[in-house]
């Protein structure tokens, strides 16, 4: 995936011997004090739950190569209680004195990842292990000294913070899109409404730009995974359900709007899509609104 500035930064630090690459996973684990797990957790094809198969595959490799104390950091977005399950698996083979499983969710935006890493809104560490917490504090010390807030919470708390954050942002997008629909019907300028809402400091202006449905590698899968978790724990997240349904309807709504503008004479028309990625400054087309809209126009 393309990320502005990343290639140059990797090259610079590799040449300065601040960055190295291991030839095998075994070597990387043995030589490290902290092991970050940063693999994909896509939505399963048959339901809304997160596919954790890549997580468990990596865990088996880590278990084989734990020789001294390791802080095992879950960066991947995983459902609440995943850390508990991982700890149980490792404890079957290794002593608790040799490891600590913690949650450290990432909040990077594609296209803005370098800035978000260097100047994050917050650093969230989920652990009740003092040694592991101190290790992570030392790691992030240069960033903390810049004034970044550091939150030490429970492992489950950190896991849920990530999902709840993404679901809230997705809800803001679906909300402003529905308000935009009402603005069209009432002949009101949605841009003015958006600005007026955003000037309220309790709300803020970000994620209040009306447009296509949300997409990408996070919001679609994370809202669905959160609903799956809620179902597992017999909890009704009606707002998140509505967010997902509203977002799914958005594609059909835009398709119908385009057809209406063309007076339903869409056959043999040439329609240009300016960008098929889900957002600017990335080449990621996962859950892209454009790629969902194009087939609807062909129907």
Regions found by a protein language model. Give the residues of each.
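Structural/interface elements that position substrates and couple domains in central-metabolism enzymes
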Residues: 1-299
């Amino acid at each position: 995936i393309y990320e502005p500035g990343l290639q140059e930064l990797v090259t610079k630090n590799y040449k300065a011997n601040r960055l190295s690459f291991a030839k095998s996973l075994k070597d990387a684990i043995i030589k490290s004090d902290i092991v970050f797990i940063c693999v994909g957790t896509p939505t399963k094809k048959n339901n809304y739950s997160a596919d954790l198969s890549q997580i468990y595959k990596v865990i088996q490799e880590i278990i084989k190569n734990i020789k001294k104390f390791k802080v095992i950091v879950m960066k991947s977005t995983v459902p609440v209680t995943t850390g508990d399950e991982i700890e149980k698996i490792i404890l079957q083979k290794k002593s608790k004195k040799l490891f600590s499983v913690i949650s450290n969710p990432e909040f990077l935006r594609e296209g803005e990842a370098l800035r978000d890493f260097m100047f994050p809104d917050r650093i969230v560490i989920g652990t009740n292990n003092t040694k592991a917490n101190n290790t992570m504090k030392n790691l992030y010390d240069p960033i903390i000294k810049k004034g970044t807030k550091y939150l030490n919470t429970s492992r489950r708390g950190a896991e849920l913070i990530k999902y709840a954050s993404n679901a809230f942002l997705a809800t803001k997008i679906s909300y402003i899109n529905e308000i935009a629909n009402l603005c069209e019907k009432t002949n009101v300028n949605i841009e003015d409404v958006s600005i007026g809402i955003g000037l309220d400091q309790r709300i803020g202006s970000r994620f209040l730009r009306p447009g296509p449905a949300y997409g990408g590698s996070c919001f679609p899968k994370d809202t669905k995974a959160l609903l799956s978790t809620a179902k597992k724990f017999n909890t009704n997240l009606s707002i998140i359900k509505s967010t997902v349904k509203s977002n799914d309807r958005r594609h059909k709504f835009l398709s119908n709007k385009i057809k209406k503008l063309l007076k339903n004479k869409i056959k043999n028309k040439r329609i240009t899509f300016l960008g098929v990625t889900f957002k600017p400054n990335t080449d990621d087309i996962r859950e892209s609104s454009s790629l969902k809209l194009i087939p609807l126009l062909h129907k």
